[in-house]
């Protein structure tokens, strides 16, 4: 379904004076960030001979630790812009955060299973607002189709909430659900 192009940037606040140093990499907990954090840790340990530690936390905690510059967390593995622009607008000018000069592009979108898409002829996000689709997405019997928009604290959840409104899905009976990714995954498997 329709995706939004978002630029993801890696914070490069790693300053090795020697390759044997320990780098603390924040892990904000979404699957893409966790994968990138693990890849960065592998590069630090396997290619640079250093040590790496993954430190879990939400964006506020990770950026706060980077800003304090006390070695609590030195790297944010997956900065999504414009979702996290408030953090970068604050920390980059202060010099406590440096963004990669070689950013990569990430795509953010919405998905349904192929089986669901085929059964209900879903080809665009607006199709989720059709009455038969809303009914099929209503797992708790309240008459509204649940739509996972992200976890509490994720800037993307706020963006997704606005997008659902702008697509007219609230008026069509779609209910935005904020929950941890693991909770969402468990619900999908039910």
Q: Can you annotate each of these PLM segments?
A:
Residues 96-149:
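A conserved helix-loop-strand patch within extracytoplasmic ligand-binding domains
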Residues 37, 55-94, 187-189:
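Pocket-flanking alpha-helical
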Residues 32-50:
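Short, polar/charged alpha-helical segment
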Residues 4-15:
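Bacterial N-terminal signal peptides
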Residues 22-38, 59:
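Extracytoplasmic "Venus flytrap"
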Residues 18-20:
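Boundary at the C-terminal end of the N-terminal hydrophobic targeting segment
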Residues 30-31, 51-65, 171, 175-187:
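Short helix-initiation/N-cap motifs at beta->coil->alpha
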Residues 73-77, 149-190:
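Ligand-binding pocket segment of bilobal, Venus flytrap-like solute-binding proteins
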